[in-house]
């Protein structure tokens, strides 16, 4: 019998190769899961340079196909039913019942009857009552059209004691009903296992998350959920916001369970949370992923931080701030299983150490990056020390880019994002809506412009609920809940309607009204520029000095005046004013056809009447205007505009009440008469008053101002129009007022009210009925304010129709809301909240850039006052004076002029001219087309851009034919005799020239002959 040979042992070399191969595979796996930490530090330098206005504004684009649109809620915030059907107590039940979570300023809620009710209970005992309203909640999801719904399971509802054992069947049934309803609607669930509501029994028995044993109990609870619900769930979140759980639950004690331990305890709890998460991830990965095919992650919250100055030190401090909040949990999971180096270097013994086996356990335990970004952590619960003296910022786009670079381009699912409004705000939540728009826009830019892999977005939250440490003092829901009602009906807010439309459009698709229009204006269109006040420099040139001087060439090298000897005085000429020619040169360089400026009443008539006329100033204006005409530039002259000091009035009038005094109107008519007589020969377009409708002007002053305008208009119409053939009107400031919530009828009414008070106040008497707007009168009577004067019938006849065209200045658009959200920006008089869309571009002085507002206000004026000839007599913005390229002004001018073109071409507005503001920085710092320094003017890039628009007479495209416009020249009336006799004058000049040459030759040769004879 042959003996069996013993099995051959693999040679030592083979074993070594297998070991090396195994190590290589582990290294490759680690490399796939990790990136070199610290790459995110590049983010600040990348975004340090201010973006071009086109990139900083709204991006008209859509999200990728298959993008996940979600909305979320949390069990304790919304479920209520805290004692129903066997639910156990959670740490939040205990925390709110014993210490109270809401701040002392919890609002007094007004019942429907109008009587004040007691403050809301500062607990989540009932909250939004979602436990008893599954159908109601899911109908809200159906209205929104979301693809995913994030909710959390209450650990204490399915396991009242927190430990594995007999589960609470009613609790399981509730979540099954919810999941089944979601399946019927085609909405995918995103389920959070732990959203801060630990069973109280586990806190009492083990000390909560401070005990490592809780990780195993959490694993058992997760296994129960995976087994019962996992077949219907593709996205799982293990723990929500571990930073808040650890730091504010066990270190500061601000949140449940309210343990005011040391920072060491906070770091220990975070350590245990990471281990608990990792165990659950491995449980799912091993036992449930093969059959259920889901994905598991942990929801990490973060702020964003900007350096105080762009120095290496400050950038390192910003990186450290993110390490201490987000990197605390993200680096162990997404990089190498260990804490950030900055934490280990700064915290020394406070930070627990991971064993090598724990590092392997934790590393790579996320199938996607679940990000939470919003007010709860980012701007309310962030520990001030973790800012490291840098500046917080609500910039989601930059945070997404940082995560992308720091953690090796993970797929990012934004699982919580939104803002909040006051607890008293009901359904018109404009502030929340615009923050939602901002965050979604930044997400879209991160995807389309930065290449970040964002797979989904979750608006927070579905409905109003209990807001943790803020109680019911704020609201974060897309649906309004009346907490005092029995049925707790969900009513969609403006934010819900906005989000529903955005999901339907899958983003912000390009719309026809957002596209630039190609086309041209009519040939006689007035292209102008504005200089509110030309610099009146009456310094005469050296040639007007009648004195005689000797040049002391041997000693002082100076001119010495010869006493008693004077030259004959000559008549002054316009060339004597050295300040005029440079301004004309600038205007000719711009190639504008019109120039608008205001006269200085106080300079011309220092005493306010014609007893003292400053003829030098008047002569300067006469020269300025006549030189404009000779340069083929049409002057547009305003008689008055409010300005400091004394509102632009002569001191004598200002000290006697200014426009409050009815005699000022008569003085204005007298002043206008002088200007018409002295300057009207060269002026075809007059403005009586430029932008008089300021909000700080009283109704009495406005009444007298209207009368003054009408007197001046009739004076011109009766005495000067026939000879001078000019036109005259008033120029009103007309910024557009837009309803903050486009879905709100209340906001539409408020916007119309503000338009009537801002524009209609002075426009309606002139261009409309001859009386003040009915809206104004009714509103003031309702407020028991009877200060608005009444016109007599004679005054109505005087004021009504006192115009030849409608002139408006337009700079920006303002949003108005009827809900009182920010007391600092609330107008109690008109009961209106002013605000802005935070996605709009803003100038350095915070003026919003909203081009479509110009088109809207022109259409509103046409609707109110008919098809009148209109001029935009001022439109412009300030820009960074230190920037070499005034790119914001270029963007502003291009888009506002294009909206004016749309009004002319598409809306058939009778638009006759457009005036850009302003000529130079000399009179309008930061707003000019020319920089001014040391008596030198330097054109900015925006000037050349505006000139190009003027040269094209609009916007020429590849398919746009330019309109042929023959060049016109201003007729010089004094030159009429010469213009009609050009040929005769040339012939006479030739004869005179020939005669002079002949005399010269005769004289020359006669002299020569005499010399020869001698």
Swiss-Prot record:
It is an enzyme of class 3 (hydrolase). Inhibited by D-saccharic acid 1,4-lactone and taurocholic acid. GO terms for biological process: calcium ion homeostasis; carbohydrate metabolic process; determination of adult lifespan; energy reserve metabolic process; negative regulation of systemic arterial blood pressure; norepinephrine biosynthetic process; positive regulation of bone mineralization; positive regulation of MAPKKK cascade by fibroblast growth factor receptor signaling pathway. Induction: Induced by 1,25-dihydroxyvitamin D(3) in kidney. Down-regulated by angiotensin II and up-regulated by statins through modulation of the RhoA pathway in epithelial cells (in vitro). Isoform 1 (but not isoform 2) is up-regulated by thyroid hormone in adipocytes. GO terms for cellular component: apical plasma membrane; extracellular region; membrane. Disruption phenotype: Mice display a syndrome resembling to human aging, with short lifespan, infertility, atherosclerosis, skin atrophy, osteoporosis and emphysema. They have various metabolic abnormalities, including increased insulin sensitivity and decreased insulin production. Mice overexpressing Kl have increased resistance to insulin and IGF1, a lifespan extended of more than 20%, and generate fewer offspring. Residues 517-955 are annotated as: Glycosyl hydrolase-1 2. Residues 1004-1014 are cytoplasmic. Homodimer. Interacts with FGF23 and FGFR1. This is Klotho. It comes from Mus musculus. The gene is Kl.
């Amino acid at each position: 019998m042959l003996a069996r040979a013993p099995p051959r042992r693999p040679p030592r070399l083979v074993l070594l190769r297998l070991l090396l191969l195994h190590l290589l595979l582990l290294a490759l796996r680690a490399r796939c899961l990790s990136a070199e930490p610290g790459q995110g530090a590049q983010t600040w330098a990348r975004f340090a340079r201010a973006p071009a206005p086109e990139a900083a504004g709204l991006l008209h684009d859509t999200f990728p196909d298959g993008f996940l649109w979600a909305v979320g809620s949390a069990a304790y915030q919304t479920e209520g039913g805290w004692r129903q059907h066997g639910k156990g107590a959670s740490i939040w039940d205990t925390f709110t019942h014993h210490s109270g979570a809401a701040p002392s300023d919890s609002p007094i809620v007004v019942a429907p009857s109008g009587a004040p009710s007691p403050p809301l209970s500062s607990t989540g005992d009932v909250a939004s009552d979602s436990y008893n309203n599954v159908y109601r909640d899911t109908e809200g999801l159906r209205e929104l059209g979301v693809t995913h719904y994030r909710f959390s399971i209450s650990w204490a509802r399915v396991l009242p004691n927190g430990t594995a054992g007999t589960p609470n069947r009613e609790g399981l049934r509730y979540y099954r009903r919810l999941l089944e309803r979601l399946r019927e609607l085609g909405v995918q669930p995103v389920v959070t296992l732990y959203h801060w509501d630990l069973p109280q029994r586990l806190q009492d028995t083990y000390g909560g998350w401070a005990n490592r044993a809780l990780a195993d109990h959490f694993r058992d609870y997760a296994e129960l959920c995976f087994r019962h619900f996992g077949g219907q769930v593709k996205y799982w979140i293990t723990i929500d916001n571990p930073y808040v759980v650890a730091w504010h639950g066990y270190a500061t004690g601000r949140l449940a369970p309210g343990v005011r331990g040391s920072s060491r305890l906070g770091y220990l709890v975070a350590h245990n949370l990471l281990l608990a998460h990792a165990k659950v991830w491995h449980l799912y990965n091993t036992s449930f992923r093969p059959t259920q095919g889901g994905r598991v992650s942990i929801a990490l919250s973060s702020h964003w931080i900007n350096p105080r100055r762009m120095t290496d030190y400050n950038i390192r401090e910003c990186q450290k701030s993110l390490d201490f909040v987000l990197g605390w949990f993200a680096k162990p999971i997404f990089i190498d299983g260990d804490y950030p180096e900055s934490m280990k270097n700064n915290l020394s013994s406070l930070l627990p150490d991971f064993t090598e086996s724990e590092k392997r356990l934790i590393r790579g335990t996320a199938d996607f990056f679940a990000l939470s970004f919003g007010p709860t952590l980012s701007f309310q619960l962030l520990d001030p020390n973790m800012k490291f003296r840098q500046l917080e910022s609500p910039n989601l786009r930059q945070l997404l880019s940082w995560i992308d670079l720091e953690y090796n381009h993970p797929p990012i699912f934004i699982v919580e994002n939104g803002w909040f409004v006051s607890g008293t705000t009901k359904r018109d939540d404009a502030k929340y809506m615009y923050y939602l728009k901002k965050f979604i826009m930044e997400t879209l830019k991160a995807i389309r412009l930065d290449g970040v892999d964002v797979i989904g977005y979750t608006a927070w939250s579905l409905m109003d609920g209990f807001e943790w440490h803020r109680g019911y003092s704020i609201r974060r829901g897309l649906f309004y809940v009346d907490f005092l009602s029995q049925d707790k009906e969900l009513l969609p807010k403006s934010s819900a309607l906005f989000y529903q439309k955005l999901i339907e459009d899958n983003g912000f698709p390009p719309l026809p009204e957002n596209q630039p229009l190609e086309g041209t204006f009519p040939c006689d269109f007035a292209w102008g520029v504005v200089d509110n006040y030309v610099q009146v420099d009456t310094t005469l040139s050296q040639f007007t000095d009648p004195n005689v001087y000797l040049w002391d060439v041997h000693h002082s090298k100076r001119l010495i005046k010869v006493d008693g000897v004077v030259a004959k005085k000559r008549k002054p000429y316009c060339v004597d004013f050295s300040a005029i020619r440079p301004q004309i040169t600038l205007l000719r360089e711009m190639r504008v056809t019109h120039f608008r400026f205001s006269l200085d009443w106080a300079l011309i008539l220092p005493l306010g009447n014609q007893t003292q006329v400053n003829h030098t100033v008047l002569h300067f204006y006469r020269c300025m205007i006549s030189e404009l005409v000779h340069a083929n530039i049409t002057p547009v002259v305003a008689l008055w505009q409010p300005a400091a000091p004394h509102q632009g009035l002569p001191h004598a009038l200002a000290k006697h009440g200014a426009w409050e005094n009815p005699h000022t109107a008569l003085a204005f008519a007298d002043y206008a008469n002088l200007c018409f007589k002295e300057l009207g020969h060269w002026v075809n377009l007059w403005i009586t008053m430029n932008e008089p409708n300021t909000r700080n002007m009283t109704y009495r002053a406005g009444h007298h101002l209207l009368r003054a305008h009408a007197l001046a208009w009739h004076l011109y119409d009766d005495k000067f129009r026939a000879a001078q053939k000019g036109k005259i009107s008033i120029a009103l400031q007309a910024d557009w007022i837009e309803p903050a919530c486009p879905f709100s009828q209340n906001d539409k009414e408020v916007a119309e009210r503000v338009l009537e008070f801002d524009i209609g106040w002075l426009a309606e008497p002139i261009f409309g009925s001859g009386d003040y707007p009915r809206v104004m009168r009714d509103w003031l009577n309702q407020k028991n304010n009877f200060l608005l004067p009444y016109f007599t019938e004679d005054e109505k006849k005087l004021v009504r129709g006192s115009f030849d065209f409608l002139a408006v200045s337009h700079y920006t658009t303002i949003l108005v809301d009827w809900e009182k959200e920010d007391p600092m920006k609330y107008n109690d008089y008109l009961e209106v909240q002013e605000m802005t869309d935070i996605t709009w571009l803003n100038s350095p002085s915070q003026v919003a850039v909203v081009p479509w507002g110009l088109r809207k206000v022109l259409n509103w004026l046409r609707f109110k006052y008919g098809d009148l000839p209109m001029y935009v007599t001022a439109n412009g913005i300030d820009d960074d004076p230190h920037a070499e390229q005034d790119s914001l002004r270029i963007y502003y001018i291009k888009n506002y002029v294009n909206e004016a073109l749309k009004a002319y071409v598409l809306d058939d507005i009778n638009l006759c001219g457009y005036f850009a503001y302003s000529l130079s920085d000399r009179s309008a710092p930061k707003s000019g087309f020319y920089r001014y320094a040391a008596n030198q003017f330097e054109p900015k890039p925006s000037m050349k851009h505006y000139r190009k628009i003027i040269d094209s007479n609009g916007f020429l495209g590849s398919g746009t034919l330019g309109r042929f416009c023959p060049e016109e020249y201003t007729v010089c009336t004094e030159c009429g005799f010469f213009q009609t006799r050009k040929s005769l004058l040339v012939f006479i000049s030739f004869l005179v020239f020939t005669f002079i040459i002949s005399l010269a030759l005769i004289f020359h040769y006669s002299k020569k002959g005499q010399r020869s004879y001698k």
